[in-house]
């Protein structure tokens, strides 16, 4: 009889365990009407004007007549320094704007925005002293563009085409963003190739060996890493690089950003 009396209590405790288990989400799912604001580029840099901006990203269903923007850098004069758009009617095409010039659409073999489970590493290497380079995974998709870019007073916006005072606010993103990285250097092609083959997110102690010794490599130039791993909805995206370049999520009325288990842990 004692065992029978304890059994309901044990079952109740077991149920509580199941209910309180937390799900760790790996990415954010944008469905229009939402964006993330980061700091002005000049305030985030350490020394040089050399940058590499990277996204692990996948597509999703589009419900708009506009071309969704993955990100934008718009300066204080409302000039688009750099932006990438996915073309609504094409699953393998992107359009890039550099220094307010819209380049012809680029068709890319192997790109499929209609597949929400296929994540791509998109890398932008830019500075005011060298021409811009853009990669999809380890393949250059804009290797010879003669454009130098001074993004100093531009604010990094992810998920839309936005200027700092939001008088421009359009082309909202549709799709998944798994991780964002910002480096204060132009990464080597070999580094980007290595990263594209290893989609796992950088761990908390990526700058250290197993023995706790600091690794002095290109990793020291990582000035922003936003892993987008959440256990609950938050409006602030913390920067795990140690430089406190946090981002803030904004949404229009009637819109939201969803937490998703898609992507790397």
Where are these regions (language model features)?
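Sec-dependent N-terminal signal peptides
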Residues: 3-14
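Short structured motifs
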Residues: 36-41, 102-109, 163-165
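Extracellular glycan-interaction patches encoded by glycine-rich segments
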Residues: 152-178, 187, 209-213
């Amino acid at each position: 009889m004692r065992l029978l009396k304890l059994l309901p209590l044990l079952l109740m405790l077991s149920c509580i365990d199941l209910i309180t288990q937390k799900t760790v989400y790996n990415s954010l799912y944008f469905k229009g009407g939402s964006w993330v604001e980061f700091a002005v580029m000049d305030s985030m840099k350490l020394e040089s004007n050399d940058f590499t901006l990277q996204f692990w990203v996948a597509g999703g269903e589009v419900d708009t007549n506009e071309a969704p923007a993955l990100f934008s850098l718009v300066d204080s004069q409302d000039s688009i320094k750099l932006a990438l758009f996915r073309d609504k009617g094409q699953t393998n095409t992107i359009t890039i704007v550099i220094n307010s010039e819209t380049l012809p659409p680029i068709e890319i073999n192997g790109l499929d925005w209609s597949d929400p489970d296929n994540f791509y590493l998109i890398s932008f290497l830019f500075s005011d002293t060298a021409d811009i380079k853009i990669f999809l995974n380890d393949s250059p998709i804009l290797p010879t563009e003669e454009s130098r870019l001074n993004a100093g007073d531009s604010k990094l916006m992810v998920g839309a085409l936005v200027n700092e005072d939001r008088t421009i606010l359009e082309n909202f993103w549709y799709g998944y963003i798994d991780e964002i990285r910002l480096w204060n250097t132009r990464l080597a092609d070999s580094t980007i190739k290595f990263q594209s083959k290893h989609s796992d997110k950088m761990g908390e102690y990526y700058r250290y060996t197993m023995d706790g010794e600091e690794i002095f490599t290109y990793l020291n130039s990582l000035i922003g890493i936003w892993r987008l791993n959440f256990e609950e909805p938050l409006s602030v995206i913390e920067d795990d690089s140690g430089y406190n370049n946090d981002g803030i999520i904004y949404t229009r009325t009637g819109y939201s950003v969803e937490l998703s288990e898609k992507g790397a842990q």
